[in-house]
Amino acid sequence: MSKKPVRVAVTGAAGQIGYALLFRIASGEMLGKDQPVILQLLEIPDEKAQKALKGVMMELEDCAFPLLAGMEAHGDPMTAFKDADYALLVGSRPRGPGMERAELLSINGAIFTAQGKALNAVASRNVKVLVVGNPANTNAYIAMKAAPDLPRKNFTAMLRLDHNRAASQIAAKTGKPVSSIKQLAVWGNHSPTMYADYRFATIDGASVKDMINDQVWNKDVFLPTVGKRGAAIIEARGLSSAASAANAAIDHMRDWALGTNGAWVTMGVPSNGEYGIPKDVMFGFPVTCANGEYKIVDGLAIDAFSQECINKTLAELQGEQDGVKHLI
């Protein structure tokens, strides 16, 4: 019995991340090789962007993906999000030269307020929303607040890129395959303040912390390398990380939809007070996923250094949220 197609809305669909993402969704990498999809693609309603989107859709057609059951181009979130089962909010305004962070927050605040309202009005009541566009945590917070009729838990922010970056650095340090690393956590904001935490991580049952046994490397090499990786890629490539961001979005949605079999992954989710994080703060936590739901890993001990790192990233997030309070 073949499955009924699900509707996947993607914003910023003709952008760099969108281009790296759509073909993988259409091939079944995100929701499974037996799940047909209808892509509902949103771009800004400007002639150049809509024309570029048409070109991407022509390429998608030319792949003849068996699972691609339909495609639509949109310039308005009210039509793009209609009955959406999944929404990947990729499009956001990047920070331009000389632009203050407050200005960036304000511009994106308006975008994500409108998108949250549209999701609230027309999306499936079970829609799973992933915000990729930066500042991802705060944009997800804004969208969630603009959608009071949808469950808070349906809104998430992407911390998976930080998680994957941390895993690859640990693999390089230990000489072990990245697939062998279990129970890694990333806490907080998708920004250089995020706290990648391998205190509970294992490789083949052995403690990664004991294996590395180097707090100076952790503090002075590992955390800054993971935190500033995005900037290092811009410096090297002249463009921001698009393919790795798209890959992380696929990982995040696949695990949320299909489950992690007990494995820990990192998602930015609205807090309910876990680990002392105030309610509603969109915060990176270690989670497990099953039956289409995520659950924060509880009962983890937080030592003094970890608490200091968590407090720092929380303070940054609360500062961002205070900066958009007037939009909500």
Swiss-Prot record:
Keywords: NAD, Oxidoreductase, Tricarboxylic acid cycle
Binding site for NAD(+): 12-18, 108, 115, 132-134
Keyword Repeat tagged: no
Residues the record lists as binding substrate: 95, 101, 134, 165
GO MF term set: L-malate dehydrogenase (NAD+) activity
Catalytic reactions of this protein: (S)-malate + NAD(+) = oxaloacetate + NADH + H(+)
Active site: 190 (proton acceptor)
One of the protein's GO biological processes: malate metabolic process
Domain of life assignment: Bacteria
Top-tier EC class: oxidoreductase
Record EC number: 1.1.1.37
InterPro entries: L-lactate/malate_DH, Lactate/malate_DH_C, Lactate/malate_DH_N, Lactate_DH/Glyco_Ohase_4_C, Malate_DH_type2, NAD(P)-bd_dom_sf
Known function: Catalyzes the reversible oxidation of malate to oxaloacetate.
PANTHER family referenced in this protein's UniProt entry, alphabetically: MALATE DEHYDROGENASE
Family: Belongs to the LDH/MDH superfamily. MDH type 2 family.
Record-given protein name: Malate dehydrogenase
Organism name: Methylibium petroleiphilum (strain ATCC BAA-1232 / LMG 22953 / PM1)
